[in-house]
Regions:
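Residue-level "edge-of-site" marker
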Residues: 86, 104
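Conserved acetyl-CoA-binding loop-helix of GNAT-fold acetyltransferases
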Residues: 58-70
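Short, hinge-like loop/turn segments at secondary-structure boundaries
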Residues: 97-101
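Non-catalytic substrate-recognition and accessory regions of acyl/acetyltransferase enzymes
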Residues: 1-55, 71-82, 92-93, 106-111
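Short secondary-structure capping/turn micro-motifs that flank functional sites
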Residues: 88-90
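Catalytic nucleophile loop
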Residues: 66, 80-85
Length: 111
């Protein structure tokens, strides 16, 4: 069953939908997206690919897609692995507040 729910709906932010069936977050036109794989029995979201077509680059879409993915991980108590180089090399250095969700083999405290 495909689940699609709007993540961002403010005028400044594009509408990003969670496509559960295809395991990705995507723009309304489905042309820009972040793909993920669930690991560790569904407890870890591995973000494996970010794509924005050349005609839409420079608009901040990749960042909006990543925020949607990290918000989803946070609200579902998932840790995140960043196999995608955009996420690890560009998004996280610019948005270090998300580092707390990164997967670690050490148990996390719930404090």
């Amino acid at each position: 069953m495909a689940a699609s729910s709007a993540i961002g709906s403010s005028p400044a932010a594009p509408n990003i939908a969670w496509n559960e069936t295809q395991r990705r977050f995507e723009t309304e036109d489905k042309k820009a997206y972040v793909e993920y794989v669930l690991r560790q029995d569904g407890k870890v979201m591995d973000i494996v690919h970010t794509f924005v077509p050349s005609s839409k680059r420079g608009l901040g879409l990749a960042s909006h897609l990543c925020v949607a993915a990290f918000n989803h991980a946070k609200s579902h108590s998932l840790s995140v692995i960043t196999s995608c180089s955009y996420v690890s090399d560009t998004f996280l250095p610019r948005n270090p507040s998300w580092n707390s969700l990164l997967y670690s083999e050490e148990p996390r405290s719930n404090i």
